[in-house]
Amino acid sequence: MSETENVVEAIDVHKSYGRNEVLKGITLEVARQQVMCLLGPSGSGKSTFLRCVNHLEKIDSGELKVEGIHVGYERVGNQLHELPKRKIAAQRTRIGMVFQNFNLFPHMTVLENVIEAPQRVRGIAKAEAQEKAIILLEQVGLSDKIVAYPNQLSGGQQQRVAIARAMAMEPRLMLFDEPTSALDPELVGDVLDVIKNLAASGMTMIIVTHEIGFAREIADSVVFMDEGIVVECGSPKEILENPQNPRTQAFLSKVLR
């Protein structure tokens, strides 16, 4: 794959829970090294779409590819068949995901949390995994917390560990699902700074966020979703300063008060 091709391609993606259709034909492209921010009210389908990208949720129809490969499926003729769990897990090593609520292992130290997946999933030797983990923890400003346990950290520190843990797998794509929504306001800035540094390093990212100022600063493209559809998509300037759709205008007028 060339460096200019899309990392993520979603084509007419549908997803329902029972009779509730959550995604109603999402079509999006994310180019390599692009940062896309997904905005929208609660229940608009943003987080569901993000979880579909790495097959934490199964799509009902459409296509979702990361670096040209169907995530969680293989095509046989005109049919998509779900892969075995082992192959899905292998695919997910290319995709890092950071959730709202950290999801660190409470019985492991910070260092142990970061080296667990590289050792267990990728088979990296412990010494090499530790060396890389220490560098990552330095990058997120936690080199002094290596032997601490999650319950000894603030929420912001735990989220920065979660980012380092995801990066330890050397992903090609990072997904962030409202990474600051569970944090006290004074802790948000440090986490956003880490994500900004990732963007500056060229990491391809999709970020679900309610931080409008952050989206304006970091995003190459902004997508406004509502009721399971893409309402409007464009540059931060286009969407945040001059939205064309009344639904986008109404949403921004509320959150920017």
Tell where the protein language model's regions lie, with residue ranges.
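Short coil-to-helix segment of the ABC ATPase nucleotide-binding domain corresponding to the Q-loop/switch region
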Residues: 108-116
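Catalytic Walker B motif of ABC-type/P-loop ATPase nucleotide-binding domains
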Residues: 174-177
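A short, proline-enriched helix->beta-strand linker immediately N-terminal to the Walker B motif
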Residues: 168-172
